[in-house]
Design a protein with these regions (language model features):
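Low-complexity, polar/charged sequence tracts that form flexible coils or short amphipathic helices
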Residues: 89-91, 98-100, 219-220, 228-233, ...
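Solenoid scaffold repeats with emphasis on beta-solenoid/beta-helix
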Residues: 3, 35-37, 71, 79, ...
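Small/polar beta-strand repeat architecture
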Residues: 173-222, 357-358, 365-399, 407-408
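Ser/Thr/Gly-rich low-complexity blocks that favor extended beta-strand/coil architectures
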Residues: 90, 114-116, 137-191, 334-369
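Short glycine/acidic-rich loop motifs that flank beta-strands on beta-rich extracellular proteins
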Residues: 34, 90-96, 116-120, 223-226, ...
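N-terminal extracellular ligand-recognition/capping segment immediately after the signal peptide
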Residues: 7-9, 19-26, 32-79, 84-98, ...
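Conserved GTPase G-domain signal focused on the G5
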Residues: 6-22, 28, 294, 439, ...
């Protein structure tokens, strides 16, 4: 059944708030299985003032309580929303789409943007000694107070906490810029207004940006994704352009089967904005079934284009022979469901990341956003330790990424930590950090877990890792956070195949890794470029340690006579 938004009073007019019209339309559609809600093509505006409000715990985002929502889809079955190419323009802090426990939902043919983004930018007009000047665009509303620069976003005044340098020629992070004027380094600088619209930054030993480069000024962090998919199954996001989001482009958690087709997080053509989303383009937590990413462009976001993982929960107390208290340790994982009754739960050592037992969850009792009591179907292992972690083996989706492009973002490319079957094929990857990162940790982000079957095939890697070592040591970086991987007989990751890819690189490092049982690097072509000066972080093109069953063969190196790798502390001739 096709339903037009005209029926509910939607208007593609500047200054008209369409939030209530959408709310009424979605309530109507909830009672109609298979409803198709259609927007006549236009430019529709949304404000948070009269939007629905809900407590949401969104993984890897700021956990700040109530959020305002424009499109709140809850328990819809078979709904389709077709924008027919319409632009949805948002104002201030709100989530455009929440898809909560819906089945067979499709969103297609829309453009998402914010009238005013959650960042500011300026141009470097002077840089010498221990200071530089930043020229803000004419008319920028800001203030300098308490040795800080402040901007307004959605009625709140936010303090800048970091700077990222972009090259206006490539529209990408500048060579070797990294996060070197952010976080702790930013707190060391002194700030003053040299004249209206020009800010001077001073500090000993700060990394000076290049004159003419663009500085992105970051305030707040990860307020709201453009799409939040929570639970449900069979969700399709098709032909969607996200030009800005004050958080991630998409955060999906506990969803079974999600498909992204022509889902683009991309700069608006003709815009001078350097940034799209202020965090990852796409992010999947505790998902199940199949994740498919096809023909997508993910660019210029302030974190990775794609991250797939679970969450390790830290053991804090043994309550009985079959019962544990666990904690969600990272601030951006608070309140996230970790398991359901019947799920297979893995017990993992914090220091080695190696599993030592598997039990089924019998009951999962959430005390609050921090602590959870898990009761198991059998007695706990005798050697369970406080500060070990548990992971959910039942939430390990398969991932397929094809015919997609990732580029010009801050940080890395694909972050993969799922034990499901993974295929990356026919993609173009150009990132300032590692193009692919396969990790796992139980110390900071607590992002689980090990991979079991990864195929990286027929991709092009173009000048990756030009901000090194900030976001990786090599084009492909396999670095589970194990302090001394050589101390353990067992490996954390398994079966990683890198085949028939083309690597164009200005530097040496192609693959760096440890704790992998079964790694293949076969039939790849490596070419040199002069895009950037080499940084020489790695001595050898392939450096592996604490690895087993390594195959390196039939590759084309720029200079075969010098193709030497380092495997388990031994130099070997690689072909």
């Amino acid at each position: 059944m096709i339903i037009s938004m005209d029926q509910f009073g939607a208007k593609p007019e500047q200054g008209f708030d369409n939030t209530l019209a959408v709310m009424s339309a979605l309530e109507y559609c909830r009672e109609i299985e298979g409803a198709e809600l259609v927007f006549p093509q236009g430019r529709y505006h949304f404000w948070p003032d009269k939007a629905a409000e809900k407590q949401l715990f969104i993984s890897n985002h700021d956990q700040e309580g109530l959020r305002r929502i424009a499109f709140q889809l809850t328990d819809h079955n078979g709904i389709t929303i077709d924008g027919q190419g319409s632009e949805f323009i948002f104002h201030g802090p709100m989530i455009p789409f929440v898809i909560d426990h819906c089945r067979n939902a499709t969103i297609r043919n829309i453009v998402i943007d914010w009238e005013n983004p959650m960042f500011a930018q300026g141009t470097v007009i002077r840089a010498d000694d221990d200071s530089f000047d930043l020229q803000l665009p004419e008319g920028t509303n800001y203030k300098i107070e308490n040795d800080g620069v402040w901007f307004n976003f959605g009625g709140k005044t936010e303090k800048v906490w970091g700077l990222n340098e972009f090259d206006p020629r490539t529209k990408a992070p500048a060579y070797q810029s990294g996060d070197r004027i952010s976080w702790g380094n930013y707190r060391k600088v002194r700030i003053e207004e040299s004249r209206p619209g020009v800010i001077t930054y001073r500090g000993k030993n700060i990394q000076l940006p290049q004159i003419g480069n663009v500085i992105v000024m970051r305030f707040s962090r990860r307020e709201n994704p453009a799409f939040f998919v929570n639970g449900g199954e069979n969700v399709i996001l098709d032909s969607i352009n996200i030009h800005h989001a004050p958080g991630m482009g998409l955060l999906a958690q506990w969803c079974r089967n999600i498909r992204l087709h022509k889902f683009n997080v991309m700069r608006r053509p003709g815009s001078d904005r350097m940034v799209t989303a202020t965090a990852d383009a796409t992010h999947f937590v505790f998902c199940r079934g199949q994740i498919t990413i096809d023909q997508c462009l993910l660019e210029n976001q302030l974190d990775d284009p794609c991250n797939v993982h679970g969450i390790y929960a830290r053991i804090t107390e043994k309550l009985g022979e079959d019962q544990l208290m666990v904690e969600l340790a990272h601030g951006m994982s608070k309140g996230i469901k970790i398991a359901e009754p019947g799920d297979l739960i893995e017990f993992v050592r914090r220091d080695s990341l190696l599993p030592y037992a598997n039990l089924r969850a019998k009951n999962v009792k959430v005390l609050n956003k921090d602590y959870i009591i898990v009761t198991f179907d059998q007695p706990l292992p005798d050697d369970v330790h406080i500060h070990d972690v548990i992971g959910n083996r039942s939430s390990n989706p398969d991932l397929t990424v094809t015919h997609s492009t990732v580029r010009a973002n801050r940080a890395r490319g694909f972050l993969i930590t799922t034990a499901g079957s993974v295929l990356l094929e026919h993609n173009k990857i150009s990132t300032p950090g590692a193009g692919i990162k396969i990790s796992g940790d139980a110390n900071y982000w607590f992002e689980s877990g090990d991979v079991k079957q990864v195929m990286i095939r027929n991709n092009e890697f173009m000048d990756c890792n030009y901000c090194c070592p900030d976001w990786g040591r090599a084009v492909i970086d396999i670095d589970p956070e194990i302090e001394n991987p050589e101390a353990y007989e067992q490996c954390y990751h398994r079966n990683i195949s890198i085949e028939n890819n083309r690597f164009v690189t200005f530097d040496v490092g192609i693959v760096s890794g440890h704790s992998v049982d079964g790694i293949r690097f076969v039939n790849n072509v490596i070419e040199t470029s002069d895009s950037y000066p080499p940084h020489h972080v790695m001595k050898y093109p392939i450096e592996l340690k604490a690895c087993k069953n390594v195959t390196i063969s039939d590759n084309q190196w720029p200079n075969d006579s010098k193709a030497i790798g380092l495997v388990n502390d031994s130099e070997i001739k690689i072909t």
